[in-house]
Amino acid sequence: MTQFKDKTLLVTGAAGKFGRLAVAELLARGATRIVAGTRDPAGLADVAAQGVEVRRLDFDDAASLGSGFAGVDRALIISTVAANRTEQQRAAVAAAKAAGVGYLAYTSAPYARPNADAGGIADHYWTEQAIAAAGLDFTLLRNHIYADMTLQGAGPALTSGQLFDATDGGGRNYVTRADTARTAAGALLSATGRDIVDVTGPAPVTQEQLAALYTKLTGKTVTRVGLTGDQMQAGLEAAGLPAFYAALLVAFDRDAAAGYHAVTTDAVERYSGRKPQALADFLEENKAALAQ
């Protein structure tokens, strides 16, 4: 599972949570030529001290893309959160191809598609298309929703005693950020050919089940309240969210209702060598965070 450990392996966005986890996994698995790309190399001094080459790499700076990808054999492109991320990521793919990179892994999202109702997922679709058109080998890692996000969403639910959603009872296959980062590192170390992979937890979890987990772990009763998409949109806007951001969240719930988030695969175990952590175990492990 580490046949490419002696190739030059680049991780973009290496100063972020995902990037740091991916670099740490590459180090743990014996990679010998790791390049960590970041807009601010000074922020990765601790990583450089571990023998990792740190390069300035800014998706909005063509010059840094050229030097950042130079001499790289295989690269992990971690999707950005910028409003212009489609353009950013297309530029990164073009730079990788121009530099002679032979393989790209990319952190995408479930059922990436160009439809108007796809919300921010359309950005992932167009990046996937750019990667496919580049003629390189690739693994498109369609990461499902992070289990970590349920810690952030717990506060309002525990305060109000209600967990609102428009999923129509559809499940989500929550996967931890750590598991997805280990999976991405494993793909960088071992994947060949061209593949699209859903990266999931061990089983889908409905919002009703999530509410029950919150209740069990905190002793505070949380009840799931199902809404229509329009009701969810109105409620989010009333809570102060901008309309465009509320629409993204509603689109995400709509995808869960359609079953797009209920897929289960062995990708985590295949590329990391570990079984994915279940949401219940993750929340139990982080129970203290629910009390904050």
Where are each of the predicted segments found?
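Basic/polar N-terminal segments that are highly enriched at the extreme N-terminus
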Residues: 1-6, 288-292
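Short acidic/histidine-rich motifs immediately flanking catalytic phosphotransfer sites
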Residues: 70-76
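Oxidoreductase cofactor-interface core, primarily capturing Rossmann-like NAD(P)-dependent enzymes
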Residues: 2-35, 39-42, 60-63, 70, ...
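Short loop/helix-cap segments at secondary-structure boundaries that form the rim of catalytic
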Residues: 43-50, 67
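Rossmann-fold cofactor-recognition segment
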Residues: 48-61
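Structural recognition of the beta-strand scaffold that forms the well-ordered cores
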Residues: 76-77, 106
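Short glycine-/small-residue-rich Rossmann-like dinucleotide-binding loops
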Residues: 58-59, 79-80, 287
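A hydrophobic C-terminal alpha-helical subdomain
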Residues: 230-292
